[in-house]
Design a protein with these regions (language model features):
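N-terminal accessory regions of S-adenosyl-L-methionine
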Residues: 1-148
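Conserved alpha-helix/loop element of class I SAM-dependent methyltransferases that forms part
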Residues: 143-168
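A short acidic, Gly/Pro-enriched loop at the edge of an enzyme's catalytic core
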Residues: 227-237
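A short glycine-rich, Lys/Arg-flanked "PGG" loop and its adjoining helix->strand segment in the class I
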Residues: 251-265
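Conserved beta-strand signature within the Rossmann-like core of class I S-adenosyl-L-methionine
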Residues: 266-274
């Protein structure tokens, strides 16, 4: 696992929390640290303070003794300032209280550390270690559609060529990725791609069938995207969004607003939907946000996927097509 490799550990490593939301809320972590603080001196053999290249603390890890084999609990600090300060204060109290016999620093690349966290949570989910779901696995055919894949690749490559983009040099963010059917088509085109969806079962199936790479998949709510994704991307994609109904239009507006915040200048948006009615709403909602783009009739008689596309380029803070 990347988590062990990144931290240079020989023993197994586990997260105290079981989701990205859990990593931000930090409730299990605070309980764990509270229990550690009550241990007598020298109870913990060793610990790590995890720091970035500049020396700032981004997490900690504690070694746990067990007859069947020692293991580590890893604690990444939350992004929110108050939560991070609370966790760091409790960690420092444990480290400075004589409870840990040996403490050393481990310098890591923050991007690699985040990738390791994603892989850990995605693999654990696919192995059904993080839920008690009794649903059967979706068949592999649910995650693959070569006809759709080819049409998506053609559309993406055509738009890139017409607008002077080199996809192989671009990092992409795909929102609402589902089980990764569309991801399988486009990930070979980009330098790298991060995929998010709030459906645990969809991410689980995508990782299990290989349409989603575990180190590049996250179960997070797109309405709170910037809470969990701090980076900006060269391309932001939402492929076969929906279904968009009257009652959930406000939710989609929030998703669009969050998605746009993660796009770099000189990057592009590409959203696809099934119906003209959905596209009319999408284009109008984005125009209300000051985003004007091209609406593309991409219908195909063979299936319902990606019938309408919206494409916009961001340049000097403004959108055009």
């Amino acid at each position: 696992m990347l988590l062990q490799k990144t931290l240079g550990l020989k023993e197994d490593a586990y997260l105290v929390e079981g989701s990205f939301e859990g990593l931000e809320m930090n409730l299990r972590t605070l309980d764990y640290l509270d229990k550690l603080s009550m241990l007598p001196a020298g109870s913990i053999d060793s610990a790590l303070t995890i720091v970035d290249k500049g020396g700032s603390a981004i997490g900690a890890a504690f070694k746990n003794k067990l007859d069947g084999g020692d293991f580590w609990f890893v604690i990444p600090y939350p992004a929110a300032k108050a939560s991070r300060q609370q966790a760091e204060k409790l960690v420092n109290a444990v480290l400075g209280g004589g409870i840990v016999s040996s403490v050393r620093k481990k310098k890591v690349d923050p991007g690699q550390f985040r990738k390791a966290l994603r892989e850990y949570l995605a693999v654990s989910l696919a192995e059904q270690a993080l839920c008690e779901c009794d649903k059967g696995r979706e068949p592999k055919s649910f995650a693959f559609n070569e006809g759709r894949n080819e049409r998506l690749r053609v559309l993406m490559q055509r738009l890139a060529k017409e607008n002077g983009f080199n996809l192989k040099e671009m990092s992409a963010l795909e929102i609402c990725c589902g089980n990764g059917m569309s991801t399988a088509a486009i990930k070979p085109l980009f330098k790298d791609i991060l995929c998010i969806d709030n459906d645990r079962c969809a991410i689980c199936n995508g990782v299990y069938h290989g349409t989603l790479d575990p180190e590049s998949a996250m179960v997070v709510d797109a309405m709170a995207l910037t809470r969990f994704v701090g980076e900006k991307y060269d391309a932001v994609l939402g492929l076969m969004l929906g279904t968009i109904y009257e009652f959930n239009k406000n939710i989609w507006r929030m998703i669009f607003e969050e998605a746009v915040k993660t796009l770099k200048d000189d990057g592009f948006l590409l959203f696809t939907v099934n119906t003209k009615e959905e596209m009319d709403f999408l284009a109008a909602a984005l125009e209300e946000m000051g985003i004007r783009g091209a609406v593309i009739d991409n219908r195909n008689k063979n299936d319902i996927y990606d019938g309408w596309a919206f494409f916009a380029v961001r340049s000097n803070g403004r959108f055009s097509h």
